[in-house]
A protein has these predicted regions:
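Interdomain hinge/linker elements that couple catalytic modules in large macromolecular machines
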Residues: 18-178
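A cross-kingdom feature that marks ATP-driven nucleic-acid transaction machinery
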Residues: 2-15, 19-27, 142, 147-264
Length: 264
């Protein structure tokens, strides 16, 4: 799992600080993709033998992604906003050739997406909201993806073309949702954002459309949900799994969502 898991309450502070380190000691020995899908019971038993992952995972989703949380916990979200603004106002013009006069529109675009994610893309609507041409909106989305502020998903990466609109958009990590969204946070969005964020390292992630939420490496289907999530949406689909929050152990093809954070 990227960055540092860290709790919001004093009693969890030490445990959360060593959350990732404990897991890595275990997973360096036993974890690879084939173990995750074929022997998840053994991995979960080892992890749960060291700590209770669920409360730590809940903290991680809100606060644990960036290590500067350790430096200033009270102003963590404010710092995240400042970093995002720096990337848009300074780095995008310098590194991507974005016109500095248009950074206000890019920030507006990010703000719209933060309120709407996961966003099934209507480029014409987005373009109208920020007052730019369709192709300019696509360029801005690509820039925000390269800047690790967004994750852009396509239904078919093999045939994707230049300037093709993404099929679904997520903020880059779940902490950004809590920091930037103006509406109440939907936990299902947080779960999906976490899954995309973690699975994209070392794997291709495609939007599943009618076959689950995500297709991984062109073959494995993941549907994301809570502990009571059923297989209705992925019934009879080969190599399909549910990634469920609020469970410590796997049940058949229903796997703990938190375990995805250690696949790379």
């Amino acid at each position: 799992m990227r960055a540092i898991g860290h709790g919001t309450h004093g009693k969890h502070r030490l445990t959360c600080a060593v959350y990732r380190q404990h897991f890595l000691l275990i997973l360096l020995v036993v974890l690879a993709e084939k173990y995750y899908l074929c022997q998840p019971e053994n991995i979960c038993a080892k992890v749960n033998g060291f700590c209770k992952p669920l409360p730590l995972f809940k903290d991680y989703l809100q606060y644990g992604y960036y290590p500067y949380y350790m430096e200033n916990q009270r102003d963590y979200y404010t710092t995240m906003e400042q970093v995002s603004n720096f990337v848009i106002e300074t780095e995008l013009p310098q590194l991507c050739g974005v016109d500095a006069g248009n950074t206000r529109k890019i920030k507006a675009l990010l703000g719209i997406l933060a309120t709407s994610v996961p966003f099934e893309v209507d480029i014409s609507k987005l373009s109208a909201l920020i007052g730019v041409h369709r192709n300019t909106t696509l360029e801005y989305l690509a820039d925000l993806g390269r800047a690790d502020l967004l994750n852009l998903l396509y239904a078919d990466l093999v045939s994707v073309k230049k300037m093709q609109k993404p099929d679904k958009i997520y903020l880059e990590n779940p902490n950004m949702i809590y920091a930037l969204a103006s509406n109440p946070v939907k936990i299902g969005t947080v779960w999906e954002t976490f899954a995309v964020n973690q699975l994209k390292y070392g794997h291709t992630v495609e939007y599943g459309k009618q076959t689950g939420d995500f297709r991984i490496d062109g073959k494995i289907i993941f549907e994301v949900g809570g502990a009571d999530k059923t297989f209705k949406q992925i019934a009879n689909i080969p190599d399909s799994y549910i990634l469920a929050d609020d469970i410590e152990y796997p049940y058949g093809h229903k796997l703990p969502l938190w375990l995805v954070g250690f696949m790379y």
